[in-house]
Curated annotation (Swiss-Prot):
GO terms for cellular component: cytosol; glycine cleavage complex. Its EC number is 2.1.2.10. The glycine cleavage system is composed of four proteins: P, T, L and H. This is Aminomethyltransferase. Keywords: Aminotransferase, Transferase. It comes from the Bacteria.
Amino acid sequence: MLKTPLYESHIAANAKMVDFSGWSMPINYGSQIQEHNNVREDCGIFDVSHMLAVDIQGSEAEKFLRYLLANDVAKLQENKAQYGCMLNHDAGIVDDLITYKVTDEHFRIVVNAGNRESDVAWFNQNAQNFDVAITPQTDLAIVAVQGPKAVAVIKRVVTKEIAAEIEALLPFSFKFFSKWMVARTGYTGEDGFEVILPATQVKKFWDSLLENGAQPAGLGARDTLRLEAGMHLYGADMDTSTTPLERGLGWSVDLSDEHRDFIGKKAYLAKKAQGVDTKWVGVVLKTKGVLRAGQEIDFDNGEKGYITSGSFSPTLKVAIGLAYVPKQADNPVVNIRGKELEVELVKPKFVKNGKSLI
């Protein structure tokens, strides 16, 4: 099994390790709910070095990414980041990822752990007619520093000059400090940063964060935090069999430049014209119980919906989920252990900056 550069640190902290896409990763360090609440109220740190940073460089880097991605990197200024989907020719989602613009000829993309090899292969397959170099940065580590006190903690572990520059970063902006890249991005619905740095330096950085008030958090808390924030998990909420239209991600497909072609555009436009017969929603269980991926939602007209992600919400203290359901249907219920339990359909975002949105 693959190990991140922080593997020994997790073992020393008595983390419960699990297999995640072939990587030995911490699911929790004792209490998933405590780790979750700490990110909502204070500062938690995550080892996400199983994800991969890939640099796209060359005179046609922007041209290539305008073709490769459904969102339009031409709208990005330097030192800004953009969320988007990479589609196949049928408009199915190959991956969702964040693209960072360093210069006109240098972009960095961070891809999901489970898609590392397939994404890089897709990049290379589609780059053959472009003047670009694709470089997976396998010698880098990634640490997410998340929570309302993330700024305070990170300021304690860097110099005063760097602290001021980090604090000034706006959401979805980033800056390089030598080989370190600090971005004001995250996957929790809280303020925070994702730091991409040389693997040889990550243990010292991790330890200094812990010494200055941060608490480690595992993949369990990462999942409940992103679910509360209404953020998609690739492989659970979407995959190549789904288009952005069916998963509430149409906003991330940029169609404003009608002359731009991108992979999947033709199929996407056809699907858009045809219309989708489902909508992407949040689900809240009205009674005690747990919502899980794969559960059916039944409606009084006989139609069904399906939950793609579900869990107990530590912040809201109820079971929540993300689901696709028929556009017109009433009185939703889920069947849990033979009982029909009422659920409420809400916007697919439950918590932001520690506050309930439902």
